[in-house]
Amino acid sequence: LPLLIYVDGKEYHDGIDISPGELYQRMRLNQMEVKTAAPTVGQYYQAFKNSIEGGAKEILCVTLSSKLSADYSSAKNAANLVKTENPESKIFVFDSRRAAVPQGLLTIEAAERLNAGQPMEDVLTYLENAWQKSSLIAALDTLEYLNRGGRIGQAAIYVGSTLRILPIV
């Protein structure tokens, strides 16, 4: 499911209503308020139910890091709701503990392994081992977007700008 992106209060679905390139370009050109939100429990619930009703025997959902987003929590709660109604359903929610490219690569590899016929248990073991070997380091050239996204306050911007400190995340 796509993340929800709010640009000046208007809702977009990541990669559907707005592309990353378009979002970044608009952010650079305008002083917009941009917020993100995880898909809701209800959205995950509906996606899981639709997949089961469509004949899925097993569902694997690889989420953004639970330390960065409510994505994992929403998916896990929805999976539990579906399992309560349909105890034989097999829904596996995996916290990638990653975001961006590392999460995407883990997800693609898991899908390829499942499509090649590997058992779900083996794919989950792979994911549990592989996430620890992946990382993403980003050097930021401005604190502006961290502030706009609500990650840091004005005091942090003042100190960072005054001392010319930029984070590596």
Feature-to-residue mapping (PLM):
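N-terminal glycine-rich phosphate/adenylate-binding segment common to multiple enzyme folds
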Residues: 43-72, 79
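N-terminal glycine-rich anion-binding loop in soluble enzyme alpha/beta folds
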Residues: 1-43
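Short catalytic-loop micro-motif centered on adjacent basic/acidic residues
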Residues: 35, 61, 93
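N-proximal short alpha-helices
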Residues: 16-21, 51, 55, 96, ...
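Mixed-charge interfacial surface used for oligomerization/domain docking
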Residues: 1-10, 31, 67-84, 89-92, ...
